[in-house]
Regions:
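A positional "C-terminalness" feature that preferentially activates on distal terminal regions of long
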Residues: 1-240
Length: 240
């Protein structure tokens, strides 16, 4: 059946009421109450992802055996192990294939989503692999150039900071596909910046100062909203 609006369970001899969410138990899922709708939503998304993975085992195994994955893992070494790459690739793929809004709220909707995803999982995983390979090549090329740029430490620090924000170790699952798809363009933009740097370092310094002023104001606002427990999609969208 559909998830109830509130869940009442008995814990340590007393009744506990909370917002229901599917909890990821590793090889299964369980329904548990949570104190806030936001917490329930976050936990439920992970639990639902696990339930999809359990119901699409053959497709998940096929992703783990995709040609080129071992070679990609060698490029990925600075971000994680081959096992971590596989886990993140599967999580990102299932997220894009299965965790589309509106999320399924009953067994029929879940079964329909599984059926729709079966034929897409391998193709979507290959798209993620192609993009990941492209990003890793661009990232490695930038790191090589930055390591030889001794005369502009402020620029190196600025670009390294941007690279760290764009490509954290879990970048495959940290960003939605519609954001990730633009990352190669951002990395190429950093390379173009380095191409122009020596000809006009003063212009780069001015642009960097203007950018930092804007970025710092954005970060202050983001932190203030986070402390207040407020999610602002418009603020996040402004980042891009």
């Amino acid at each position: 059946g559909a998830l109830p609006e509130l869940l009442e369970v008995r814990v340590a001899g007393r009744e506990v009421i909370g917002f229901p969410a599917l909890h990821d138990d590793g090889d299964s899922v369980s329904l548990r109450p949570h104190d806030t709708p936001e917490e329930a939503s976050r936990v439920h998304r992970r639990g639902l992802a696990r339930l999809f993975a359990l119901n699409l085992k053959d497709q998940v195994r096929a992703v783990e055996r995709l040609p080129g994955l071992r070679e990609l893992a060698l490029q990925y070494m600075g971000f994680g192990t081959e096992a971590e790459l596989k886990a993140r690739l599967i999580e990102a793929t299932l997220g894009r294939c299965c965790l589309l809004e509106p999320l399924p709220t009953d067994a029929d909707a879940f079964a329909k989503r599984c059926a729709e995803a079966k034929s897409r999982v391998s193709l979507v995983a290959q798209e993620f692999m192609r993009l990941t390979g492209q990003l890793l090549v661009e990232h490695a090329a930038l790191q090589k150039r930055l390591s030889g740029l001794k005369t502009f430490p402020e620029v190196v620090a600025d670009i390294q900071g941007q690279l760290g924000a764009l490509l954290p170790k879990d970048f495959l699952v940290a960003f939605e596909w519609d954001k990730l798809a633009h990352f190669a363009r951002y990395l190429k933009g950093a390379a173009v910046r380095l191409d122009k740097l020596r000809n006009n370092p003063a212009r780069d310094a001015q642009a960097m100062a203007e950018w930092k002023q804007l970025a710092q104001a954005w970060e202050r606002e983001r932190l203030a909203r986070r402390r207040a427990g407020v999610e602002d999609p418009a603020l996040e969208e402004f980042r891009w």
